[in-house]
Each structure stands twice: as structure tokens, then as C-alpha cells.
Amino acid sequence: MKPNPKLIFEQPNIENTIPLSVYQASSPEKFSIEDDDKLVMHAGGSGYKISILRNDPTQEVKVHEDFQSMENSSVSLFVLNTCVIIWLDEIQKGLELPYQSISLSALQSNNDHQALYLQVLSNDYISSIPTEPTEYTSTVELIITKEKDIPESMVNRLFESMVSDIHGLYNGLSTCSAFHYDSDSDEENGDNTNGFYGMDFQDSDTNAPALEIPSSWIDDEGHDHDIAIKNIGDADDLELDEEELQRVRDESGTPVAGMNVDVGYASIVGSIRKRGEDDMGEFNKSRKLI
């Protein structure tokens, strides 16, 4: 199950988040591995504006009451290693978007201005409701542009050492998206291999494929052939050569359970007990292995 977007009431700060440059300098050997203690911010900035596209007449866009002012407010963006946060500065609330909920991101250029285009899966806070039946997944289109710089007193301290622009947001989002696996996409495409991310050991027996046995291996009731295996009592047939084994087979007329081991030039350590030997007398001397 993929994580869902959620409403948050606290924006990232220097206590729980560090910029990517600081993280790389402090622990380069763990680069690209999620930190257990703090979030890692790959990109971000303040003074952005979000527009919601409503160009499709077959879709009705609905916005949660907490985010009705999103299109008319200045927002701050945090591209973290775990999610993207859209923070509304005026109402001090934010929307946390997991990367699995962002189906597409792209750069748009209009004259000298750049914009970040996002396709977000419909959720409890921003949704697109089809007015007629459709087979496509419902998404909401967002356009993010750089509007203006806000007063330094209102700027989050995390942005002080970071260049804030649309291109940086796109690069950070693309990098972090690659860290998050979307298992639902493989299930929809029929490519559920239960690999590294989807291993389920409890169901390994029930999900195991059936063993295909050639029909020629299975005899029906009218052609049962019981093969009798005669046990001549010599479990240790190492002393029997091929001629002696063949003679026993010919005399008995049935297959003999024997073992012929070719040990090459290596010597066998210990001794082999024969049937005629006294078990009690030879107990301490037989089969002494090193």
C-alpha cells in the first residue's frame, strides 16, 4: 500500500532537517541512504505560486477547505528525501505529498520564465472527479512558478544556504523520486516478481508454482511395473568390484541395492567392517575416522 498525502501543521526546520550539502559533507559514505535521525532537503525555497489546471471539462477539481487559499497564497516548497511539502505561509499549514503520489513531473518554459509541472494522484485534499465514466487514473495538474521573494524575516533558515529556483526543484524532485519504489505500478502491469521490495516469506509455499511432471513418467493402473530391489545385506559394498556385483545381479534376477564409489587415488581412512566380524571384539577398532 502506497502512503497517502496528509495535512501537516509544522514545516521542516533546522532541528529535524539538514540541507543535502551538509549531509554529504558529514556522511559521504552514506550518500543517498535515508538518514534515521533527520530529513535531508535536496531542494526548496519560498515565494512560489501554485496554479491548479482546470482545462478538462470532463473532470471536476475539488480542493479541501484547508487549502482553498492555495492558489492565492505564497507557498514554500520542501523537496525532502521522503516527500514533497507544500507549505502555505499565510495559514501555517502544509500538504505532504509522498513521491508515490506524484505520477509525473516536468519543466515548462514560457519565454524567459520556467514552471514546474506536476501530476498528482487524486487524494483527500486535492481531487479530480470525472463527470463521466473513464478508464484512466484520476490526477490533478499543478503548475508551480516563482512569484516573488518574501521578507528575510519570514524565510525558513533552511533556505539560507540553498539556491532556490524552478530548475533546482525539478532536479531534486527527480533524484528523490528514484529512491522510492512504487509497487502498485508493477501489480497493475502484472509484473509482481516478489523481488527485493516485495518478498513475502509466509506465502512462499502457497504461491510456489506447481511442479510440471511429464505424462510419460506417470504409469496408469494397467501398466504398473513394480521393480523389486533386493537388499543383500551388504550396506558397505565398497569392497565389491563390478564383476562381483554383476554376478550377484545375474544370480538373483533382481536389481541389487549397492554402491559403487570411485575414489580415484585417494585412500580411505579407517577400516570397513565385514559381516562376519565380531561386533563386540572389533567395536573399538572399526570405522575410526580422522
UniProtKB/Swiss-Prot annotation:
Disulfide bond sites: none
Major localisation: cytoplasm
Subcellular location: Cytoplasm; Nucleus
Keyword Cytoplasm: yes
InterPro entries for the chain: ICln/Lot5/Saf5 (IPR039924), PH-like_dom_sf (IPR011993)
Entry keyword annotation includes Phosphoprotein: no
GO-annotated cellular components: cytosol; pICln-Sm protein complex; spliceosomal complex
GO process annotations (BP): mRNA cis splicing, via spliceosome; spliceosomal snRNP assembly
Entry keyword set: Cytoplasm, Nucleus
Similarity comment text for this entry: Belongs to the LOT5 family.
Name of the protein in its database record: Protein LOT5
Species: Debaryomyces hansenii (strain ATCC 36239 / CBS 767 / BCRC 21394 / JCM 1990 / NBRC 0083 / IGC 2968)
Organism phylogeny: Eukaryota, Fungi, Dikarya, Ascomycota, Saccharomycotina
